[in-house]
From Swiss-Prot:
EC number(s) on file: 3.1.3.16
Residues noted as binding Mn(2+) 1 in the record, renumbered to the chain: 163-164
Name of the protein in question: Probable protein phosphatase 2C 43
Pfam family, any one: PP2C
Organism classification: Eukaryota, Viridiplantae, Streptophyta, Embryophyta, Tracheophyta
Single GO molecular function: protein serine/threonine phosphatase activity
Amino acid sequence: MRTSKASVTQTWLLYTQLCLWKDLIIRYVRQIIRRAKSMLFSQNMVADSAEISVIDVKSHLSVAKDPSNFQIAEIRIHDSICIDIPSSEETPLLESIKSCSATTIEEHVTEFVPNISSGSYADKGDYREYMEDEHICIDDLSDHLGSSFYRFPVPMAFYGVFDGHGGSDASQYIKENAMSLFFEDAVFRQSPSVVDSLFLKELETSHREAYRLADLAMEDERIVSSSCGTTALTALVIGRHLMVANVGDCRAVLCRKGKAVDMSFDHKSTFEPERRRVEDLGGYFEGEYLYGDLAVTRALGDWSIKRFSPLGESLSPLISDPDIQQMILTEEDEFLIMGCDGVWDVMTSQYAVTFVRQGLRRHGDPRRCAMELGREALRLDSSDNVTVVVICFSSSPAPQRRRIRFCVSDEARARLQTMLEG
């Protein structure tokens, strides 16, 4: 009877050790997979999917089941990873996965198309008597434009932030006339079979012309006072193509895997290329202000400062020509922040990206994120009007990385390493 009890005890101890080893093997394999995927995405490595085999080992820890009972499940990933799993006749725990080590993943590559949602927030702030900012948020541009325009077979969206100075007339004019200024061009009435490089080039040309026409329209004193002007930051999304155009010191910042990517440059004296451009044209700064009066080096309006020749070529350092950045969105691009200088005067691009990303992880609402970021700028003592637009390119926020911790004795670790090395 004693012998029987001792045998049962030894069997139970052996079974317990086997369960522990099995669990450690599972964790070890999954750790290898995570590290390999992390290395792949961080280094942009590409491998032939035909040579790849990845398995996900799932265990069922139940005393009623055989401890060697593993479930091998194929998993899908966007890129290819190769993991070698050793097999040995002396390691029965791995016998069940040895035959699966040549499993090939069928890689389903689909073109990323953003699922767009947005939110905005605006506040005149504690130090300004009037609100001079305006903004636009259109998540479904095709529906907004109506039947007279070509309905693109991909999502279209349009956003703008306009920071007025010398009054709100100029920023209000751009907002109220944005659809006719930016989308009356023939490029939006044609039917392109594909959004290719030729179409995108025509789109950029059309956008530059829209900025020029908007500036010329405000030359008329009956529309806008000559002492009034505005910055203009716009973002146009067509499928997975993003185009950002900027005149002035509003800023657009893209979040790519948590990192801030500036999609525009501040047109002001602190931006060295702009300072050189102004000075090369005979302009000068008093402190950080153009002619001691204007905080920006590019703007729409401000005709009391601009001088034009009869041919329409600008002779003034103050111009309305936008900087335009284009890019193709991927799964790594999470959201875009657009804000006036009242935001960027008190925080960096990375600060804003981290702040919004944390908000999206908490509640997933871009409207609430825009409000929280705007209020954060006010909390940091912004002295200007504050306007924020947050555009999400995915319906779900980036998940936080799970961290699994477990402790293994030196003896168990050594035995596991010996077993894995065969």
